[in-house]
């Protein structure tokens, strides 16, 4: 699914899922890195994010895969 990843003012990250009109904060990263990792959102979803360069400019829309969550 297409998601938009943004950097928040406080230093964290959030994800917007346009298909679901959902915005959620990333609360945990499996490998302590954003790209090529599994992100857990504050609503319980887990998304597998693509492996992109560390310095990718945000916000960016990417194809993510949902692994778990309602």
Q: How would you name each of these model-derived features?
A:
Residues 1-28:
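N-terminal acidic leader/helix
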Residues 4, 38-40, 56, 61:
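Residue-identity detector for threonine
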Residues 6-11, 31-35, 53-54:
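Short, ordered beta-strand-loop transition motifs
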Residues 14, 51-70:
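Short, surface-exposed, low-complexity cationic segments
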Residues 20-23, 27-39, 69:
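Exposed regions on extracellular, virion, or secretory-pathway luminal proteins
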Residues 33-46, 51:
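Acidic, low-complexity, intrinsically disordered interaction modules
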